[in-house]
């Protein structure tokens, strides 16, 4: 019986989509519709040691900068100054794309590392709060470098927001 089952499983056809990217490698390889391979390099990497999260970030104009595939740089909120404001969003829940599912485990004082366009930016969590889901979030923008992370809260109709500020390293 087991041998018959193994033969059936082994003989099942496997469908591999050539249009689906291989995501979160150092370079993302994309096979487009005309069969040509396109390599998309990430522009950054988000690391949150406490929740064992490491995810690559892609240019705002890249097709890979979307919440269905990756941690996303929100287009309306990133400053042209790399040392300014950045807001990142990702799904939470039980999907394999729920990259921010454990964001609620962060506490004030936790560290987040952002590598962006060849520079490293260490951040520390300064505030954690929730807002009603309205399709936008209200943020307290300060006169300092800030990184915000946002996802759906585990509470119904709420948005979880993690506010951080850049750690200024003295030489």
Tell where the protein language model's regions lie, with residue ranges:
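Solvent-exposed, non-transmembrane regions of membrane-associated and secreted proteins
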Residues: 2-171
């Amino acid at each position: 019986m087991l041998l018959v089952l193994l033969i059936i499983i082994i003989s099942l056809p496997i469908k591999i989509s050539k249009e689906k990217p291989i995501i979160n490698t150092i370079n993302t390889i994309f096979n487009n519709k005309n069969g040509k391979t396109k390599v998309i390099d990430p522009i950054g990497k988000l690391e949150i040691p406490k929740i064992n999260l490491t995810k690559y970030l892609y240019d705002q104009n890249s097709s890979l900068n979307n919440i269905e595939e990756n941690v996303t740089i929100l287009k309306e909120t990133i400053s042209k100054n790399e040392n300014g404001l950045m807001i990142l969003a990702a799904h939470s829940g039980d999907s394999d794309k729920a990259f921010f599912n454990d964001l609620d485990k962060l506490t004030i004082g936790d560290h987040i590392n952002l590598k962006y366009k060849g520079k490293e930016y260490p951040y520390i969590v300064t505030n954690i709060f929730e807002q009603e889901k309205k399709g936008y979030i209200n943020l307290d923008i300060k006169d300092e470098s800030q990184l915000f992370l946002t996802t759906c809260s585990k509470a119904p109709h709420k948005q979880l927001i993690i506010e951080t500020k850049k750690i200024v390293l003295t030489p």
